[in-house]
Amino acid sequence: MYRALTWWFLAEGADTGDAALIAARAAEPSIEVSADPDDPWTRVNGRDVSRDIRTNEVSAHVSVVARVPAVREHLIRRQRAIIASAGQGIVAEGRDIGTVVAPAAQLKVFLTADPGARARRRAAELSADAGETEAAQARRDRLDAAQSEKAADALLLDATELSLDEVIGEIARLARERCLLACAGDKSS
């Protein structure tokens, strides 16, 4: 959601460094996210921006936007509402989901990976330069260090050598262990 809001400010030509402007306009766009794992999308004012929000340009500005207290308050409220409305549970991702947004979550996984591996994955996703992507991610990691702390009760999962399917499989296994996914007669464990 932070990326979607940042994308919107950039599309509007707004100065993302103007905290007063960002605070005043943070609630203007309609930001929707899909909770369906088979059909993930992010929309801003009805436009699908799922790919647009993953660019290096958005990455370069999102930390500045996310640090504005009014933005954090607004989006944390929105994230909590989405989680609360999910009924049977939801998989949520973000730098402070387990520590701020949903500290009482039944399963928290702190996903990490070697910076080079993260950059290669993002660059492949965007058809971008891996070196430029790694530099942008390193800048964001430095800016977002406070929001990237592992919750005391979170499990650490290093995905450096894992494929996306392997990461999903491991998280599903952890959820089954805690009976957060079907347990009775579940033969997929």
Where are these regions (language model features)?
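Amphipathic alpha-helical transducer elements in NTP-driven molecular machines
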Residues: 2, 19, 68-76, 94, ...
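Small-molecule kinase domains that catalyze NTP-dependent phosphoryl transfer to phosphate-bearing small molecules
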Residues: 34-36, 79-87, 97-104, 128-172
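Generic secondary-structure signature for well-ordered alpha-helical cores
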Residues: 10, 14, 31, 142, ...
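NTP-dependent small-molecule kinase module
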Residues: 44-50, 110, 117-128, 147-189
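N-terminal phosphate/diphosphate-binding loop that engages ATP/GTP or pyrophosphate donors
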Residues: 1-54
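ATP-dependent NMP and nucleoside kinases share a basic, alpha-helical "lid"
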Residues: 50-66, 70-125
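Short, residue-level hotspots on alpha-helical faces of the histone-fold
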Residues: 3-7, 77, 81, 173
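Residue-level signature of catalytic and energy-coupling elements of molecular machines
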Residues: 46, 75, 91, 137, ...
